[in-house]
């Protein structure tokens, strides 16, 4: 079962744009029974260093976007819950989406020309320890070792995520 925890990240709380603060408030308002956790870049690195030490060499050499991608997989793997990008406005309670599920990923319909991006990794939920999350983190690390010529969307982002979910479905 997916725990009622919402995870979001941004550089730091002070630099959060006003429009994103409205999004954060909408998430909290629609989900009052959920624990809300905000992580700064500094806190993200600290968690990776403390709880996922084997990822630190790759994490430290990643771009900020790649670090954010890797962190979201790791934090939900560790604690379970809902990950949501900070620029997402929430209009309903998450309970309707996650019910008794162990893993939920958004699916963007109507993007045939962008089928590589079919599954969203800007919004997903899982129980702690779900295998898709540690596999995503391991792929981020392995893909990063291929070097800077690999496109971020394929290395750590929605293309990698979509490939992984498709593989695990079959």
Name what the model sees in each region:
Residues 69-81:
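Small-residue hinge/turn detector
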């Amino acid at each position: 079962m997916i725990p009622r925890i919402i995870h979001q990240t941004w550089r730091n709380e002070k630099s959060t744009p006003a429009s994103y603060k409205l999004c954060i408030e909408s998430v909290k308002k629609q989900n009052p029974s959920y624990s809300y956790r905000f992580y700064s870049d500094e806190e993200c690195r600290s968690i990776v260093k403390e709880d996922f030490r084997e990822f630190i060499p790759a994490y430290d050499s990643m771009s900020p976007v790649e670090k954010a991608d890797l962190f979201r997989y790791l934090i939900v793997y560790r604690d379970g819950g809902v990950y949501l990008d900070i620029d997402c406005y929430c209009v309903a309670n998450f309970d309707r989406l996650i019910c008794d599920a162990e893993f939920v990923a958004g699916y963007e319909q109507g993007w045939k020309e962008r089928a590589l991006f079919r599954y969203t990794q800007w919004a997903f939920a899982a129980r702690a320890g779900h295998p898709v999350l540690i596999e995503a983190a391991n792929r981020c690390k392995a893909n990063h070792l291929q070097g800077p010529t690999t496109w971020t969307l394929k290395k750590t982002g929605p293309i990698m995520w979509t490939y992984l979910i498709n593989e695990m479905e079959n």
